[in-house]
Amino acid sequence: MTKKYLVGLVGESIEHSLTPDLHMQEARHLGLEYEYRIIDLLDPNLSEMSFEEVLAEATRSGYAALNVTHPFKQVALNSLKTSSSEVLEVGATNLVLQPGAAIHGENTDWSGFLFAIGQSIPNAKRELVVQVGSGGAGGATAYALLKWGVTRLVVTDIDLS
């Protein structure tokens, strides 16, 4: 009997996300039985719940993992029991694994970006990069750029809040 994995995406205004289709397609390719749910905290049925309450409910409901997106990538850090060193260095998580009560955080944004930039512009100059945006994903891309060998990184953000 194949184990069924219950996973989801937590965020706001994510009803049109392509993430569920991407994950379901990959699960089929790997022969995994997957159920991927959207947990949009702007949904009227969920809007009163905090991220911590959603995480507790996900644990009770048997979720194996949650992808975390805006605006919870940094908020989620407060709920982790353990995390990778990259989560601590980036200051954000985009993946929460729930093996029982030991809630663990990972950040795959940085490694995905590093792979993509290495594949798409491997010979780009790395002396100076100006990055616009410093939120949860922005921190991950900045981290990846430094790992890639950028010697001077200027980060700016138009969000004044």
Positions of predicted regions on the chain:
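Phosphate/diphosphate ligand-binding glycine-rich loop within oxidoreductases
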Residues: 2-121
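Glycine-rich Rossmann-fold phosphate-binding loop(s) that bind the pyrophosphate
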Residues: 12, 133-135, 158
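Conserved dinucleotide-binding and phosphotransfer motif residues
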Residues: 30, 148-149
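Short helix-loop-beta connector
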Residues: 99, 122-129, 150
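N-terminal Rossmann-fold NAD(P) dinucleotide-binding loop
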Residues: 138-139
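Gly/Ala-rich phosphate-binding loop of Rossmann-like dinucleotide-binding domains
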Residues: 142, 146-147
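NAD(P)-binding Rossmann-fold cofactor-contacting core
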Residues: 150-161
